[in-house]
């Protein structure tokens, strides 16, 4: 379970998150809904530890993310998958290498097993045929699917998706 307790975040005197609290139950789909510019992305970045709130707590099964050192935060990140709004693929890596990136960072499996897992994830999003292509060689929708494959590569306990359906056609959105 993730508990967000009274977090506040400001940038240059402008408050983006003001005393936000929420509980996200394990095993359930939780949605953060709001209009453009309302702070949804900032909230997600705080929840995953890419930003630190000015005040408040973010608890993962009782462990406070805001007080974790770098090593503890890296251990927690092994349990997370993140789909960023703009896909955030590495331009210098192939689609397969992008999906393998979190596996290479956090998995102790053999290279062959990491590659097999990455291909499985690409197959899940119907993108196995693009494994050797670079992000500049694929469409926006294909980039989004590659980013989804990367987000699920570690079979994360927590999966965070920022605008998961943007750039996808309706049929692919249903598949995802």
Where are these regions (language model features)?
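Conserved ABC ATPase signature
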Residues: 134-138, 142
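Conserved ABC ATPase "signature" region
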Residues: 63-64, 111-129
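Catalytic Walker B motif of ABC-type/P-loop ATPase nucleotide-binding domains
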Residues: 159-162
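Helix-to-loop junction immediately C-terminal to a conserved catalytic motif
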Residues: 48
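A short, proline-enriched helix->beta-strand linker immediately N-terminal to the Walker B motif
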Residues: 153-157
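Conserved ABC transporter NBD signature motif
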Residues: 56-64
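Helix N-cap at the start of a conserved alpha-helix in ABC-type nucleotide-binding domains
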Residues: 170-172
């Amino acid at each position: 379970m993730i508990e967000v307790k009274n977090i506040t975040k400001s940038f240059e005197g402008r408050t983006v998150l003001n005393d936000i609290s929420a509980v996200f139950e394990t095993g359930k789909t939780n949605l953060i809904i709001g209009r453009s510019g309302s702070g949804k992305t900032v909230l997600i970045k705080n929840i995953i530890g890419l930003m630190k709130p000015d005040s408040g707590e973010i608890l993962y099964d009782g462990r406070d993310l805001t007080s974790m050192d770098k090593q503890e935060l890296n251990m927690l990140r092994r349990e997370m998958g993140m789909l960023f709004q703009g896909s955030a693929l590495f331009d210098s890596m192939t689609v397969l290498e992008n999906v393998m990136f979190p596996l290479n960072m956090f998995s102790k499996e053999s290279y062959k097993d990491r590659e097999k897992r990455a291909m499985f994830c690409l197959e899940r999003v119907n993108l196995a045929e693009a494994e050797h292509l670079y992000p500049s060689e694929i469409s926006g929708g294909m980039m989004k699917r590659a980013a989804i494959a990367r987000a699920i590569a570690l079979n994360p306990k927590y999966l965070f998706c920022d605008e998961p359906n943007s750039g996808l056609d309706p049929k692919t959105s249903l598949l995802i």
